[in-house]
């Protein structure tokens, strides 16, 4: 049984916490806010063990890799609240995602978009200097 600290390490190392806007004609704004937490691994056995205790959906990518994904804001919030004390590299993304989760029933679309952009900025490394080559 993987611990919350172990799962946090997987997400810090081989995972992703992201948010994005998806076109949705039925939405008043023309977009829906979506979130995703994902761990990628060659080990299906590992992801099945994490899935048993932490939920999510396993996807066979067909290239020898598997993804374990959490995509509903309820699942994402439950997962991140459990592993947050142990996250290091993706802690800021997790905190922003938790704020986004708390807004899931809000009509403040502009506020949701702010958090989507912040998460994307953190993932690009623009705010931390990661991804920038140093001499």
PLM regions: where:
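Internal intein/HINT superfamily modules and their associated LAGLIDADG
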Residues: 1-135
